[in-house]
A protein has these predicted regions:
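Sec-dependent bacterial lipoprotein signal peptides
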Residues: 1-8
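Membrane-proximal, proline-rich intrinsically disordered regions
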Residues: 8-69
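Structured, solvent-exposed acidic/aromatic patches
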Residues: 72-215
Length: 215
């Protein structure tokens, strides 16, 4: 009798004690909000738009070394990547900022999708986009080895892992766009291609080609 009473008292305990300003798991699952929010987080770091993130992840490094931009701020003239003496804050920023944000959001999408479906495929492509830039900056990266998630993988291993991930993504997307060339998914959350899956397919293949040329 006591056991039955205790069970009934604790039934729905977590929901009953949920703060009123916090969404429930059921509410977060509506309209793909859970996966969509993590999808946006991955986009924001694979293709940074926010001014500070863009400056530190793209502009001060690749855009200058690629001769797209030059340093106009006198404060940047003494120490920068072109002089090979960039401040430590510049050097470590992408690793400390983009890497954890991309990988944490990807893990959540991986969990929510059970490693299947279009959203998972798009997440694999975004992960490849982000990690390709990072491994070209730093070389070896911790990409989640099964034996030791904190172990650093060689750049060769990173490239091969990303290509395998992109193959998985294109295997998911290709049958969909063969059936319907204008197929879309996650339109409301897709800031890159507005859900157009054929463009995601092209991006995946472009990333594979970029790595193949470098290998």
């Amino acid at each position: 009798m006591g056991v039955g009473t205790m069970a009934s008292c604790t039934d729905g305990f977590e929901e009953a004690n949920r703060q009123g300003n916090r969404a429930s798991a059921d509410e977060l699952g509506r309209d793909n909000y859970s996966t969509g929010s993590f999808f946006i987080q991955m986009q924001n770091n694979a293709f940074p738009e926010q001014e500070n993130a863009y400056q530190m992840n793209e502009d001060l490094i690749g855009n200058y070394l690629g001769r797209y931009m030059t340093y106009a701020n006198n404060g940047f003239s003494d120490k920068n990547f072109a002089r090979f003496n960039a401040p430590n804050g510049w050097v470590r920023y992408p690793f400390r900022d983009a890497l954890p944000k991309v990988t944490s959001a990807f893990k959540d999408i991986e969990r929510l999708t059970n490693k299947s479906g279009v959203t998972y495929a798009q997440a694999l492509i975004l992960k490849a986009q982000a990690l390709l830039r990072l491994t070209d900056m730093y070389g070896p990266l911790p990409i989640g080895e099964e034996s030791n998630v904190n172990a650093y993988s060689t750049q060769e291993k990173v490239y091969k892992t990303l290509i395998a991930n992109l193959n998985t993504a294109t295997d998911i997307i290709q049958p969909i766009i063969i059936a319907s060339a204008d197929a879309k998914a996650n339109e409301e959350y897709d800031k890159v291609y507005s859900g157009q899956l054929s463009n995601w397919f092209k991006l995946a293949n472009s990333l594979k080609l970029r790595m193949a040329i470098r290998m």
